[in-house]
């Protein structure tokens, strides 16, 4: 069994067409067909079956694909480790982040890191809270910046970088807009603008409202921070957001108000796999991030 055969197999399985796989891999169609046939002969099973003009995986082919993907991911990771061992200052760091940390925090820390390690490259993946945790566990990314920092996973370790307050964001013409602080219960009759189901910032907002003694009336949803802030600015409702999402400014026609009760904070940090050694460049970045935030007064 050869790596070439496995890569051909994965490409055909994804495209369900030998000629398309051949075009993408820049090899002859006959070469792919021959290698797939050799693989099936070695395994003594049929991996594909024809369905019209396309070919589909057989049940055993689907099972084989799962293991091939896992094996190829491990092999690619091993090659990356060797490359970085030979030159640890020229690696690639694959880091994930949520939308709430995209505008200021991530660019700031990467820019500072690049000053010391100019030849290290970054592959950035934005995703939801649960997606980022699974991506670290599955080796799709090396590290993830996120909040809150998870503490209940046996295969993930996290380091808290800072703790931040949660604020109420209301339209400029809101009755409470001129108050210096707000009790969250005072917003119980307002309509809320939140992220959709499955987003951790939605869960945070709902849990905070429950601590205040009410369930928020969610009238509008937005899938990113700009949408949420824009809807509040347009008078569609109020929302709750962490301090770091404001990036030193408050959106036009809105007011950011500290919540006096309940006083809720969230942790923000960086996570990495617990039982897997990071490549040198990824480990350098992990250690750099921890030191970077320990020196920043604004995050203390």
From Swiss-Prot:
Protein family: Belongs to the LysR transcriptional regulatory family.
Protein's name in the database: Transcriptional dual regulator GltC
GO biological process entries: glutamate biosynthetic process; regulation of DNA-templated transcription
One Gene Ontology term, aspect cellular component: protein-DNA complex
SUPFAM superfamilies named among the record's database cross-references: Periplasmic binding protein-like II, Winged helix' DNA-binding domain
Source species, domain of life: Bacteria
GO molecular function: DNA binding; DNA-binding transcription factor activity
Originating organism: Bacillus subtilis (strain 168)
Induction of the gene: Induced by glucose, repressed by arginine, less protein accumulates when grown in the presence of glucose and arginine (at protein level).
UniProt gene name: gltC
Assembly, per entry: Interacts with gutamate dehydrogenase RocG.
Regulation: Activated by alpha-ketoglutarate and inhibited by glutamate and by RocG.
Role summary: Positive regulator of glutamate biosynthesis (gltAB genes). Negatively regulates its own expression.
Record CDD domains: PBP2_GltC_like
UniProt keyword list: Activator, Amino-acid biosynthesis, DNA-binding, Glutamate biosynthesis, Repressor, Transcription, Transcription regulation
Residue ranges flagged as DNA-binding region: 18-37
Every HTH lysR-type domain range: 1-58
């Amino acid at each position: 069994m050869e790596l070439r055969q496995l890569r051909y197999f994965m490409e055909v399985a994804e495209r369900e067409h030998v000629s398309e796989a051949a075009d993408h891999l820049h090899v002859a169609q006959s070469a792919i067909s021959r290698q797939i046939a050799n693989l099936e002969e070695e395994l003594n099973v049929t991996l594909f079956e024809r369905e019209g003009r396309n070919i589909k995986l057989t049940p055993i082919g689907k099972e084989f694909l799962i293991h091939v993907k896992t094996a190829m991911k491990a092999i690619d990771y091993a090659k990356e480790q060797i490359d970085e061992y030979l030159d640890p200052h020229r690696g690639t760091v694959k880091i994930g982040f949520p939308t709430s940390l995209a505008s200021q925090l991530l660019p700031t820390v990467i820019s500072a890191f690049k000053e010391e390690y100019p030849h290290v490259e970054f592959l950035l993946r934005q995703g939801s809270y649960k997606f980022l945790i699974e991506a670290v566990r599955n080796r799709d990314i090396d590290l993830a910046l996120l909040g809150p920092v998870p503490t209940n996973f046996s295969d993930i370790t996290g380091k808290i970088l800072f703790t931040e307050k949660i604020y109420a964001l209301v339209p400029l013409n809101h009755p409470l807009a001129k108050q210096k602080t707000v009790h969250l219960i005072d917003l119980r009759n307002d309509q809320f603008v939140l992220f959709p189901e499955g987003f951790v910032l939605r869960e945070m907002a709902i849990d905070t409202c429950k601590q205040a003694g009410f369930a928020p009336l969610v009238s509008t949803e937005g899938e990113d921070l700009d949408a949420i802030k824009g809807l509040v600015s347009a008078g569609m409702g109020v929302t709750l957001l962490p301090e770091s999402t404001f990036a030193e400014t408050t959106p036009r026609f809105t007011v950011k108000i500290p919540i006096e009760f309940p006083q809720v904070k969230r942790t923000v940090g960086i996570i990495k796999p617990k039982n897997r050694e990071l490549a040198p460049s990824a480990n350098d970045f992990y250690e750099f991030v921890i030191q970077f935030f320990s020196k920043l007064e604004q995050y203390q």
